[in-house]
Amino acid sequence: HGRIRRQRQMCIRDRPKSMRVTVSGNLHPSVQPKDIILYVISKLGTDAGTGHFVEFAGTAFEQMSMEGRMTICNMSIEMGARGGMIAPDQTTFDYVSGREFAPKEEALKQKIAYWKTLPTDEGAAFDSEHHFDAADIRPMITYGTNPGMGVKIGETIPTSDDASFIKSLNYMGLKAGSNMLHMPIS
């Protein structure tokens, strides 16, 4: 009596595939991190990341605040990914330094030295790669029921004969071909 029997459970998962999404060049001044990820999802689809872990790379992410990077990585799940990451750099180190639960002094120096080894090696192979020009990205708005249904503000809602697309527009009270510029945002 008094014995506790422990059982172990495990979740069997396949090793995730790797995907790199690179956004290079100069962003329009009004573009925010959420616009970037909505643009990527609108181009690749909400299932593009299924079974993948996504690395976001390129100048658009390198120049982004830590909070913006968190937005991007958090929304990687909206494209079906298991997770997202952006290589640690000085922005990361500055963000961590001085935080309440961050390592202090020598311990922080050691952590930063290790974190500097984590970025992907030059020439690394990915299961899939996607490249976007930052200049093509503008503020985005979604018109449907998932983040893949997005257009640049000022563009029209596309047309489609797909039943789920039509159902989504009906649910949102919108019509294909309508210009999003004059639509109220709710």
Give names to the regions the model predicted.
Residues 1-12:
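Single conserved hydrophobic/aromatic residue that forms the stacking wall/gate
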Residues 7, 16-20, 51-53, 71, ...:
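Broad gene-expression machinery/nucleic-acid interaction feature
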Residues 12, 29-33, 37, 65-72, ...:
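Generic structural signal for well-ordered, non-membrane alpha-helical segments
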Residues 13-15, 29, 45-49, 65, ...:
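Solvent-exposed alpha-helices and their adjacent loops that cap or buttress functional pockets
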Residues 13-54:
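Catalytic alpha/beta core of large soluble enzyme barrels
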Residues 22-25, 58-60, 100, 134-136:
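Short, structured patches in soluble enzyme cores that scaffold and shape functional sites
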Residues 51-83, 88-93, 101:
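Catalytic cofactor-binding cores of redox enzymes
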Residues 79-186:
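Accessory "access/gating" subregions that flank catalytic or transport cores
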